Structure formats: C-alpha cells, structure tokens
A protein has these predicted regions:
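N-terminal binding-site loop/beta-alpha segment at the start of enzyme catalytic domains
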Residues: 1-38, 54-58, 71, 114, ...
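Acidic-and-aromatic substrate-binding clefts and catalytic sites of carbohydrate-active enzymes
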Residues: 2-18, 44, 83-84, 134-137, ...
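Short acidic capping loops at alpha-helix termini that bridge into adjacent secondary structure
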Residues: 29-32, 71-75, 125-126, 150-154
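A short, structured active-site edge motif that brings together acidic residues
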Residues: 30-44, 155-159
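Active-site mouth loops of central-metabolism enzymes
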Residues: 42-58, 97-106
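Short, acidic/polar
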Residues: 51-69, 108-113, 137-142
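Active-site groove signature of glycoside hydrolases
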Residues: 65-91
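Beta/alpha (TIM)-barrel catalytic core signal, keyed to glycine-rich beta->alpha loops juxtaposed to Asp/Glu
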Residues: 81-222
Length: 222
C-alpha cells in the first residue's frame, strides 16, 4: 500500500493516473489490491469541497476507474466523516454536541445504498472508513447489518507509538465487528524515523519542511 494525499490542486489525482499508466495494470490486476478514497469537505479543489454523498461517490468512483484504467476498485474508502473528526491531534478539542444525529443516520443510509449499487455493479468490492470514531464506525456497522448492505471491512486511522487512540474503544469495536485497521502515519509523519533530529539539518522536500507542526504532532511539549 502506498498512501498519498492530494496536498495541492495541481497534484490531485496524480497517483491514480500513475497507477493507470502501469503497463501491467490489466495483465496482473488480479494480483493487486487497489484502494482509493472519496474526499469531502476540506479540499476545496476537489468538487469545490462538497460533502460526501451518494452523488459525489458515484462521480468519484467513475473518475477513479477511468484514471486507474481498471474495471473495479478493491476497497473504496470514505476519507472523512462529514460531521468532523478528532484526527490530527484534535482529540482534546473535538466537540460533538453540535452534531445532528438524525442527519448522520440519513447520510449513512444514503451512502450504504450507493455502496450496495456499486458492489452489485462490480465497480467496487468492499468499502471502508477513514478518520472515523468508534461511535461513527458502530453506526455504519449496525446499519449495514440491519439493511443487509455491504459491511465496513476496514478503517484507516492514525496509529503509531506516539498515537495510540486506536488502542482504546476502537480496538474492541474492530475486534468484535471484524473491521481491519489500515494504519496511517506509523512513523508519526517521520518523527519516529529520527531524520528530523530536533529540527536540525531539515531534509529538503520533507513533510516537516512543508508543515513545521506536522499536522499537530509538534507542539510545546513535543
């Protein structure tokens, strides 16, 4: 797995196009597991920052299939919950009290219906979540069971020696509901690699050169 992120408008979608240009993509497709995501609010250069919905998923899947020159996607993931997330060190300021529970339940039903259509059409095989909480994941899991819709097979959340949030209620939930963790930032954006050396001799082009706080991983105590 080679995770990437469209940090700029001019590079958005480049990874999918690179995969689509692999000479062996068609010949060895059954040997590959390809995962990609639909993003929502946050990246204004992708569908003008529209939230995740059935229509944005449909459009994004078709675009990804064309870009990657493939007939199907193995794991299709929701990049962010529309209601917000505590990832990237926002766990101490995350406040769910203003969220609309009914709107979220309706959103889950709508998206599960869309995922069901895509699975039946052979365009995706499985779907997963990303940057989701234990409560949010449990809603997706239970709704899929109740409606006989495609179940959540994976969740891509941060996990490293410096970020152990998953070890709490998420680990228990994922164990019992058979949801696999696809950990991102296992080296804490490079902090655990030792290459930053306290900010001295900062490697050109590194994450820290572009984001000195490394997504909240560097603060007054770290």
């Amino acid at each position: 797995m080679y995770p990437t992120n469209p940090m700029r408008a001019e590079t958005s979608g480049d990874t999918e196009r690179v995969i689509g240009n692999w000479p062996s993509i068609k010949k060895r497709r059954d040997e590959l597991i390809i995962a990609t995501k639909v993003t929502g609010e946050g990246h204004k250069f992708v569908r003008e920052g529209a939230p995740i919905s059935a229509s944005t998923i449909q459009s994004a899947v078709e675009n990804s299939l064309r870009a990657m020159n493939t007939d199907y996607i193995d794991i299709y993931q929701l990049h962010w919950p529309n209601r917000g997330s505590y990832m990237f060190r926002k766990n101490w300021q995350y406040d769910p009290t203003g969220q609309d529970s009914a709107a979220f339940y309706d959103h889950v039903d709508e998206v599960l219906d869309q995922m069901d259509e895509l699975v039946k059409a052979g365009k995706i095989r499985y779907f997963g979540l990303s940057n989701e909480s234990a409560w949010g994941t449990s809603v997706w899991v239970q709704a899929a069971k109740a409606q006989n819709r495609p179940r959540v097979v994976s969740i891509q959340n941060e996990y490293s020696l410096l970020c152990r949030l998953f070890d709490l209620d998420m680990a228990e939930l994922c164990h019992h509901e058979q949801v696999d963790l696809l950990a991102f930032s296992p080296l804490a954006a490079g902090l655990l690699s030792g290459k930053y050396q306290g900010g001295a001799n900062l490697p050109e082009g590194s994450r820290m050169s572009a984001m000195p706080a490394l997504g909240g991983r560097i603060n007054g105590k770290v």
